[in-house]
From Swiss-Prot:
Cellular component, GO, one term: bacterial nucleoid
Lineage: Bacteria, Pseudomonadati, Pseudomonadota, Alphaproteobacteria, Rickettsiales
Keyword Secreted on entry: no
Biological processes annotated in GO: DNA recombination; DNA repair; SOS response
One MF annotation (Gene Ontology) recorded for this entry: ATP binding
Gene3D superfamilies: P-loop containing nucleotide triphosphate hydrolases (3.40.50.300)
Protein's recorded name: DNA repair protein RecN
Keywords: ATP-binding, DNA damage, DNA repair, Nucleotide-binding
Length: 550
């Protein structure tokens, strides 16, 4: 519900703040007093077109409107989905600068006009001389009938079935449309996956092989060095020279010094043999290496080539293979499951039309009940000559909401054939049609507030009293705000707001005030007799306040 409305520098208003209550709130004032300004302020704040062109009060550089609204689960979900922080209440604000720029805020966060207008659909309905757009929309008429007939749950079940059916149909159509391209992609993916599986590149393999290649290149240098050394120490002349020297020394074996030299030569020979053996072992170990530089080079070349071919890094080739296999299996599955999808499509189609016919039959029954209830309500509103008919025709194509096209038709004069309600009813009549519908549905109200703008134009007396009764009844289910000229309606209010226009020397001002009981009696008396308030009008006003509901 609306908690409060704050307005500053708006049209003829300097500054005001109104606190609303639950129930029935009426707004009254003399003709031309500016009762529509409050409605314009609400529309302005929520991003809708207003009836007034000049929004900013003359001499001011900006206009601002603030609305505080209570929260419900739907509003909370909307705010959460749009990343708007939740507060204890819903705070809505719009500021327009003199240069024309307009800024919208929800809970002090800047939002665009589209978000603000979407939010408005969760807050209230507006019905008046030029604002019965919702009643004229086919979607709204369908919602009214289904809500009245308690058919929303069945319709939701139908919508889920329809969505599943359409998903299957779209999948079948996609396969049929892309049969050739799917088969071509399967051929391509078969080639890709076979090539990748054959090469079997592992994550980190390129780096590992690069390091091994570097080691092998260094070992090649070591191998050449060992071969050169081995060639030198394995020279037969070295052994021959040592042998000759030892034979010469043997002739002088009695000489201790020569004996020591002979020992040294023997040790040199042994050390040389050991060096030869060590070098031979090194050469043998090199020949036993697991890695071959030429093979490593070939493997690295193959990895780099396939990486370039598919524009994928070497480490990502394994993931690329997995993705390609998944895509390949998915496409093969689509082809293989085409027959199965067609079976599912037929099953869902049968289920949809079964639910659709069930919903259609229940809509026909609900339509008859709604027509009866509405005719009763229209009689209460002194529209005895009006007729109302819910036209239900079978659709040519299935839809999420069913197999029916639903149009509200009416006639307001005898002898007239019923036509679409927007073609035959005036603004006031549309408002009373909507009031009759809302009264019929008052236990199923979903919007926190309803605003009626001059719903009682062109009526009076008993009709106005009946309109007031219906508004009062409706206000027991949701907050109702009414701009009215009728004392019979105003007398039933839980909150009575009066708007006055004052002509000063240099400007015109509009003031807004919530009336107490005595002030309400004076205002009702004025509404009854005009500016010249009489004892009779005061008495009648008191009677209306004492007996607000007949």
């Amino acid at each position: 519900m609306f908690h409060s409305l704050s307005v500053k520098n708006f049209i003829l208003i300097d500054e005001l703040e109104i606190e609303f209550t639950n129930g029935l709130c009426v707004i009254t004032g003399e003709t031309g007093a500016g009762k529509s300004i409050l409605l314009d302020a609400i529309l302005f704040c929520l991003g809708y077109k207003t009836s007034s062109a000049g929004i900013i009060k003359h001499g001011k550089d900006y206009a601002a409107v603030n609305i505080v609204f209570s929260l419900n689960d739907e509003i909370k979900n909307f705010l959460t989905q749009n990343f708007i922080e939740l507060e204890e209440s819903l705070l809505i604000k719009c500021v327009q600068k003199a240069e024309g720029r307009k800024n919208f805020f929800i809970n002090n966060q800047v939002v665009n006009k589209a978000i603000m207008q979407q939010l408005a659909t969760y807050l209230f309905e507006l019905h008046g001389q030029n604002n019965n757009i919702s009643l004229l929309e086919i979607n709204t008429q369908r919602d009214i009938l289904d809500s009245f007939g308690d058919l929303l749950e069945l319709r939701m079940q139908l919508a889920k079935c329809y969505q599943a059916w359409q998903n299957i149909r779209n999948e079948i159509a996609e396969i049929a449309l892309k049969q050739n391209s799917i088969e071509q992609e399967i051929d391509y993916l078969n080639f890709v996956t076979e090539e990748l599986i054959k090469l079997n590149v592992q994550t980190g393999e390129e780096e590992q092989l690069t390091n091994i290649r570097k080691d092998l290149q260094n070992k090649d240098k070591d191998l050449q060095l060992i071969k050169d050394i081995f060639e030198q120490v394995n020279n037969p002349e070295i052994n021959s020279s040592i042998s000759k020297a030892e034979k010469l020394l043997a002739k002088q074996s009695q000489n201790e010094e020569f004996a020591n030299i002979s020992t040294n030569l023997e040790e040199a020979y042994n050390n040389l043999e050991e060096a030869r053996q060590n070098l031979s072992n090194l050469l043998e170990n090199f020949n036993k290496l697991d890695y071959n530089l030429e093979e490593i080079e070939e493997r690295l070349f193959a990895i780099k080539a396939i990486s370039r071919k598919y524009n994928v890094s070497a480490d990502a080739l394994k993931t690329f293979l997995e993705e390609s296999l998944n895509r390949l299996n998915s496409l093969k599955g689509k082809i293989a499951n085409q027959a199965e999808l067609q079976v599912q499509e037929a099953k869902l189609s049968t289920e949809y039309y079964k639910l659709g016919k069930d919903l259609s039959g229940k809509r026909l029954a609900a339509a008859k009940r709604l027509e009866e209830v509405l005719h009763h309500e229209l009689k209460q509103l002194k529209m005895e000559k009006a007729t109302f008919h819910v036209n239900i025709a079978e659709r040519k194509e299935a839809a999420a909401y069913g197999i029916d096209d639903i149009v509200f038709k009416a006639s307001t004069n005898p002898g007239m054939s019923p036509e679409a309600i927007n073609k035959i009813a005036s603004g006031g009549e549309l408002s009373r049609f909507m009031l009759a519908l809302k009264t019929s549905l008052f236990n199923k109200m979903v919007k926190p507030a309803i605003i009626f703008d001059e719903i009682d134009v062109g009526i009076g007396g008993e009709v106005a009293d009946k309109v007031g009764e219906r508004l009062k009844k409706l206000s027991s289910a949701t907050q109702v705000i009414v701009i009215t000229h009728q004392p019979q309606v105003a007398g039933k209010a839980d909150l009575h707001i009066k708007i006055e226009k004052t002509q000063l020397e240099k400007e015109t001002k509009v003031t807004v005030k919530a009336l107490n009981l005595a002030e309400r009696q004076q205002e009702l008396a004025r509404m009854i007799s005009g500016k010249a308030i009489t004892e009779a009008s005061l008495k009648a006003a008191k009677e209306l306040l004492c007996h607000p509901v007949a």
